Every structure is written in structure tokens, then in C-alpha cells.
């Protein structure tokens, strides 16, 4: 079977490599070691060159490609350790709105995202291991919604315009957009110095137009969001694993011990080969999962688990 990329996909990959090689050098990345890990200049450059429109329909200003092509973007961001956290914006918000919303107000958000405006999501909750059943509550009051709850691990929430939040209500699960200024944000520490936040939602009143999906499709939309998020994060892990494998190949072909290049030692070459095999397995299951999401909308939970397991194995 031929798993090679199409010509335009190779061009997307090559052009991203040129941009990120320059903007994500070691010297550039050091600037974000101790500060807020978000590069506005790089975000603007990606927007100007149309990369934020990957996976977004042309009628919304996107480039019209599919989720596989969006995966190329996240793979390259992972490879170069780019100081950008875009899964909340380009995946959770953009892809979910594109698939489940029919209103012009929400569709206009896609156009603004393509131009570089940031949105994010807040789905995970403390003490809740089942994201499909949110603890955060929404109560209907006429044409308004009153929301209360706590979310955490929300990426770049402090610089996002709005936050997509999952809530439980009398009408089932809902996905609603909340303006950043209506919630309390608390920065959270992380080993990777990622810009993640705790989001406290206290008696926030919203219009029902803040619901991004049709009535009765909230749980379906949330499941889709969770699946596509995991797949795209796996693409980031693929990029990281590819960089690690490249570093291993470089080091073992140059370092000498006992008068020989260590790459010629059987144990070293076997471990390096194992890394390469895990890398290509991760690439293949990512391709399969993204293609199935395109064809079927929601892929099987077993397939998502397989993607996650291979991602973890490759990381080890």
C-alpha cells in the first residue's frame, strides 16, 4: 500500500519547515523558557501564509483541506517545539463549530480564526474523570443561560477572545462560548511551562445564541471534540517523536566509544530501530484516525485508544 503524501501536502510540510526552522531555533525558543510561552509574531506569520486555515472550508476563508492536512501543521509544531498552543483554537473551537453549527454568528468565528484571532476551550474539570458528563451546570432562564462551574488545563485562556465550555443542563450536554472577561482565570504551573489556566465560572449569564450546536446534539458535538482533540495532540506527539528519532540518529552516527561509532553497536542500533518503528506506527495510526474522522465524523473509541496507546509507547 502507498502511504506517501500528495504533492500539495508535501509542499505544505516543506513550507512549514522553512518558517519554523527560522522562527523556532534554539536561540528563539530560549526567549520563552521563563516567560509566557506564546509567540504572537509566529502566530501572525502562520495566519498571513494561510496555515491557520488548514482544515477549514474555503467559504470561511480557509484553504479547504481536511483533517489530515491540519495534522501536518500540528506535527510540525511538535517537531520544532513551537511556542504555540493551538489545539483549543484550531481543533476544539474551529472544527466543532464547522461541523455542528449552522448560525452565521458562529461561522464568522471561523473567518476570524483564519485571520489569527484566538479562541480556546475549557473541557476538563477537577475531580471528574468523565469529560462526557460535565460537572459544570447551566440553567435556562427564559432566553438566557446561567452557568456555574470550574474548569482547568485551558490553554492560552488569558489571550483568547472566548472560551468554549462543556456544561450539563436540563436539555443534556451543551457546548457554549463564554467571553474570557466573564470568568476568573488563574495560571497553573506545568513542567513544560505551557500557558494553561484554571477557569472559574461564577453566575455567568449567556444568551442562548452562545450554544454552538443544534438542539439535542451537544453530547455528539462533545464526543467529536474529544476525539479530534486526542488525534491532533497525537500528531504533536508524532512531531516530537520524529525530532527525538532524528537526534538519536545524529548522535549515534557521530559519537565514538572504544574507537568505534556507537551506532555500529548492536544494542544501540536495535534500540534506534525500535524508536523508528514506533515512530512509523504512530504516523500510520494517526493517518488512519484522521481519515476515519473525515469519512465517518466520529471514529471508534477502540481506534482512539489505539492512537493514544501508541503515542504513549512512542513517547517512552
Show where each model-derived region lies:
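A short core secondary-structure module
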Residues: 133, 150-183, 187
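Structural signature of FAD isoalloxazine-binding scaffolds in flavoprotein oxidoreductases
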Residues: 64-73, 130-134, 205-206
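Internal glycine-rich alpha/beta core junctions
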Residues: 191-218, 246
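Helix-loop "lid/cap" segments that line or gate small-molecule binding pockets
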Residues: 92-101
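Cytochrome P450 C-terminal beta-domain/meander region
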Residues: 132-148
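A short, Trp-centered hydrophobic/proline-enriched beta-strand micro-motif
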Residues: 115-126, 165
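Conserved hydrophobic/aromatic beta-strand scaffold that supports enzyme active sites
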Residues: 135-137, 162-166, 175-177, 196-203, ...
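Alpha-helical interface subdomain recognition
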Residues: 1-80, 84-85, 100-103, 112, ...
Amino acid at each position: 500500500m502507498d502511504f506517501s503524501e500528495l504533492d500539495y501536502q508535501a509542499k505544505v510540510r516543506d513550507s512549514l519547515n522553512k518558517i519554523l526552522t527560522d522562527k523556532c531555533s534554539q536561540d528563539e525558543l530560549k526567549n520563552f523558557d521563563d516567560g509566557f510561552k506564546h509567540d504572537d509574531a509566529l502566530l501572525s506569520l502562520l495566519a498571513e501564509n494561510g496555515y491557520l486555515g488548514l482544515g477549514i472550508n474555503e467559504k470561511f476563508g480557509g484553504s479547504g483541506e481536511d483533517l489530515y492536512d491540519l495534522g501536518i501543521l500540528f506535527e510540525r509544531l511538535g517537531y520544532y517545539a513551537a511556542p504555540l498552543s493551538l489545539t483549543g483554537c484550531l481543533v476544539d473551537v474551529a472544527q466543532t463549530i464547522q461541523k455542528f453549527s449552522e448560525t452565521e454568528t458562529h461561522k464568522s468565528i471561523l473567518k476570524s480564526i483564519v485571520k489569527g484571532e484566538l479562541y480556546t476551550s475549557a473541557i476538563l474539570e477537577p475531580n471528574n474523570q468523565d469529560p462526557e458528563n460535565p460537572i459544570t451546570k447551566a440553567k435556562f432562564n427564559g432566553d438566557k443561560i446561567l452557568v456555574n462551574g470550574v474548569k482547568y488545563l485551558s490553554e492560552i485562556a488569558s489571550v483568547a477572545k472566548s472560551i468554549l465550555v462543556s456544561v450539563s443542563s436540563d436539555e443534556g450536554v451543551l457546548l457554549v462560548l463564554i467571553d474570557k472577561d466573564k470568568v476568573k482565570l488563574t495560571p497553573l504551573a506545568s513542567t513544560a511551562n505551557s500557558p494553561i489556566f484554571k477557569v472559574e465560572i461564577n453566575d455567568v449569564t449567556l444568551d442562548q445564541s452562545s450554544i454552538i450546536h443544534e438542539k439535542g446534539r451537544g453530547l455528539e458535538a462533545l464526543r467529536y471534540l474529544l476525539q479530534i482533540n486526542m488525534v491532533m495532540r497525537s500528531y504533536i506527539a508524532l512531531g516530537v517523536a520524529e525530532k527525538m528519532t532524528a537526534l538519536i540518529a545524529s548522535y549515534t552516527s557521530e559519537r565514538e566509544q572504544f574507537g568505534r561509532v556507537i551506532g555500529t553497536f548492536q544494542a544501540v542500533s536495535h534500540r534506534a530501530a525500535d524508536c523508528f518503528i514506533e515512530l512509523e506506527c504512530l504516523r500510520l495510526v494517526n493517518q488512519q484516525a484522521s481519515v476515519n474522522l473525515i469519512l465517518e465524523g466520529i471514529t471508534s473509541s477502540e481506534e482512539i485508544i489505539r492512537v493514544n496507546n501508541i503515542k504513549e509507547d512512542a513517547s517512552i
